[in-house]
Amino acid sequence: HADFTFDQKYGFRDYRGGGRSSGRETIGRVAAGAVAAKLLERLGVRVFAYTSAIGPVSIDRSRMEISKMWENRLYMPDDIAAKEAESYLEDMMARRDSCGGVVECVIEGLPAGVGEPVFDKLMRLWQSMMSIGAVKGVEIGDGFEAAVSTGSQNNDSFCIDSAGHPAKRTNHSGGVLGGMSDSSPVVIRAA
């Protein structure tokens, strides 16, 4: 927890656990996010998030069904992974230990060209995720996997879709090219 750093900077530690770095602080973000999601829906933009990994248990994208995330308490869109993660968490609790996880956020319907090419780069999205106390890293698209991929593996080649518009065959870039949205789903993960 951030008690140490808050005490060092401000000379104050909220022993009740309700300080600025408390997980309870995120409730305002959740409420505002729910309102923002409803407003964005009116513009044809859909935002949703789910748990894609807990400890070593990750969803299998071939089994992924977004509607399934509402059917388990871990919000995992893969029934099998959700059961494995439940078992893993029970083991962690029995050992009086904890583990990390990954939350994936997807934004669909965002038109191409949102963001800036130099400094803003849709930065507020990643910045907001990094402002959550427990988050240690954020990646877009394939993220750090790009570092161990070849250019031909990681390249999103362009094509013309059935409506005659430019599109990408894959989305390794996570819907962001040069800091701007490219009209593909924006995919952001936080761990």
What residues fall within each predicted segment?
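Long, contiguous hydrophobic alpha-helical segments, chiefly transmembrane helices and signal peptides
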Residues: 4, 22, 26-31, 140, ...
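Charged, low-complexity interaction tracts
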Residues: 2-20, 175-176, 183, 189-191
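Predominant activation on well-ordered alpha-helical scaffold segments within soluble catalytic domains
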Residues: 2-5, 28-37, 86, 123-130, ...
